């Protein structure tokens, strides 16, 4: 239990006004922390064949290096969340970044694929600290509407990573070897570590209560018993699953079905990401005029409508227009769902953030795997998967949220 002094101290922290350059710098650092996953995966994708050749192994084993990264990234959040609640945000974050840096550098030094896969696992185990703790810090420092605006702006900045990192990774491969990608990740880790140590202030006082398995499970039970939290988490998870389905299946639809050149497809992919960024920026302003819950409901309804159209459009321009609008709706969905879920647990934001992130990542991973394994190679098939995810996200929200509030 929390005594009155602790609750008062946390209330003082959340009411502290952060404005101007300090706020922009904080958003940049938190977005940088959240961009670790796309940087670590998307920069590496162009080098998969090079790694396969370097270790004289099959594509099956190099794909396992990606799988090990995603598994560790999902499960590792469950560790850092409670740690940051008990020991403060900075110490676990510094440990995570240090582990990420060490594993990234280790990937350059190993001489067999088994060690490489193990180091990718450790790299993700360290990198996930930034994602889970960034959400907790926002929840520590900002109230509901401002938190929604901050999350939206963070997503604008961090969404640049998946847009630019494959290009940057390919550029490094042209100039150097595949090892240069992991050296770059190591250097990025150094920069992030310095930012955190010297410019990021502690936002959560460490707890004096004992840190043990019983205390951790008790917090997770509290989180799992909260129906609104579960609903917001599942809604955002299935909505992000729709985006992962699009990422996994869109290259087959646009390149093989519609016959687009790879470079044109890259432009289309970037344009769709731009739509998400634009609506995220709009959301950051609208949350001060409309309730985040209202904007979340609007985003889910619109995403359902546009994704339904995908199944009936066989023309590239019509399909792309509907897809652009559907993906853009995530700018209303993702920041508001995260804000509303996190706002349920001001006292142990880290644990809530861990459960939120792990659930989102697991759902998105399962959906992405299903699309990759069973195929969504036509506009109708991809549209069906995106609509199903959107409908589930909207269904959880509209069917249960009024009863749970």
PLM regions and their residue ranges:
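Paired small-residue
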Residues: 99-106, 114-122, 317-325
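Helix-loop-helix hairpin linking two adjacent transmembrane segments in secondary transporters
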Residues: 115, 152-198
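Helix-to-loop junctions at the C-terminal end of transmembrane segments
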Residues: 77-88, 279-292
């Amino acid at each position: 239990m929390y005594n009155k002094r602790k609750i008062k101290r946390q209330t003082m922290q959340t009411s502290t006004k952060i404005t101007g350059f300090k706020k922009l710098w904080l958003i940049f650092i938190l977005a940088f922390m959240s961009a670790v996953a796309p940087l670590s995966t998307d920069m590496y994708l162009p080098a998969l064949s090079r790694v396969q050749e370097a270790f004289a192994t099959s594509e099956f084993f190099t794909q396992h290096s990606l799988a090990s990264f995603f598994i560790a990234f999902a499960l590792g959040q469950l560790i850092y969340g409670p740690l940051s609640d008990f020991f403060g945000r900075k110490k676990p974050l510094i440990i995570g970044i240090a582990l990420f840096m060490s594993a990234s550098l280790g990937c350059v030094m190993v001489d067999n694929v088994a060690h490489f896969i193990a180091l990718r696992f450790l790299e993700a185990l360290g990198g996930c600290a930034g994602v889970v703790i960034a959400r907790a810090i926002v929840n520590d420092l900002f109230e509901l509407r401002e938190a929604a605006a901050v999350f939206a702006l963070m997503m604008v900045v961090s969404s640049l990573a998946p847009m630019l990192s494959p290009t940057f990774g390919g550029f490094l491969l042209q100039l150097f070897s595949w090892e240069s990608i992991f050296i770059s990740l190591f250097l990025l880790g150094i920069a992030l570590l310095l930012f955190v140590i010297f410019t990021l202030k502690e936002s959560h006082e460490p707890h004096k209560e004992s840190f043990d398995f019983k205390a951790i499970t008790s917090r997770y039970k509290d989180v799992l018993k909260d129906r609104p939290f579960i609903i917001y988490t599942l809604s955002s998870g299935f909505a992000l699953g729709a985006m992962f389905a699009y990422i996994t299946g869109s290259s087959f639809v646009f390149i093989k079905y519609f016959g687009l050149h790879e470079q044109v497809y890259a432009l289309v992919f970037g344009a769709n990401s731009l739509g998400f960024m634009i609506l995220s920026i709009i959301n950051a302003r609208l949350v001060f005029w409309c309730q985040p819950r209202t904007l979340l409901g609007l985003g889910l309804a619109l995403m359902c409508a546009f994704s339904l159209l995908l199944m009936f459009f066989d023309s590239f321009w019509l399909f792309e227009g509907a897809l652009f609008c559907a993906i853009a709706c995530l700018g209303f969905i993702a920041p508001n769902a995260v804000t509303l879920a996190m706002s349920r647990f001001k006292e142990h934001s880290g644990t809530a953030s861990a459960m939120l992130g792990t659930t989102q990542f697991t759902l998105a991973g399962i959906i992405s795997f299903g699309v990759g394994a069973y195929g969504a190679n036509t506009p109708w098939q991809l549209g069906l998967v995106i609509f199903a995810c959107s409908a589930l996200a909207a269904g959880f929200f509209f069917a249960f949220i009024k009863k749970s509030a």
